[in-house]
């Protein structure tokens, strides 16, 4: 999935990662504290950041993405598809797009084994802040399998080259 989104957004920073699971060349670790670190220190502006925040407390990450969008830094954030929570209401007041991933749930990767883990009990959505002025929040969908298949085709092309 990340490869497909990277093709669309050219993601330059993984804002909540470790050396073992970073998806971008530049990343911010828990110890570096992404909520306190200026993202502009890690990418050219305008640019996009990948953010898969800890699901236990998403609100401060929504606030950080909204703040960074004022600095011409866009964010693509993967979160549970739950529209009943306060952070969702806060996100749609500042985000440019909510993209629901439909047609199945995402399997997450076990950080130790590197293998997909099924049993995700919720669907997922992407909340996107663009690095330019916001006009409204658009609600869209993307098929999970289309996203995964597109990413797999890109990976296969890279490996064949």
Model-flagged regions — what are they?
Residues 1-161:
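Class I S-adenosyl-L-methionine-dependent methyltransferase catalytic core
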């Amino acid at each position: 999935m990340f490869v497909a989104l990277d093709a669309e957004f050219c993601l330059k920073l993984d804002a909540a990662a470790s050396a073992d699971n970073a998806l971008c060349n530049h990343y911010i670790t828990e110890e570096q504290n992404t909520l306190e670190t200026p993202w502009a220190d890690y990418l050219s502006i305008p640019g996009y950041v990948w953010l898969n925040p800890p699901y236990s407390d998403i609100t401060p990450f929504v606030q950080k993405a909204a703040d960074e969008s004022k600095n011409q830094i866009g964010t693509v954030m993967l979160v549970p598809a739950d529209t009943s929570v306060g952070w969702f209401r806060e996100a749609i007041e500042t985000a440019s797009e909510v993209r629901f991933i439909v047609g199945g749930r995402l399997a997450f990767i076990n950080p130790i084994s590197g293998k997909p883990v099924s049993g995700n009990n919720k669907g997922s959505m992407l909340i996107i802040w663009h690095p330019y002025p916001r006009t409204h929040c658009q609600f869209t969908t993307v098929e999970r399998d289309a996203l995964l298949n597109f990413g797999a085709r890109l990976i296969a092309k890279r490996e064949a080259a």
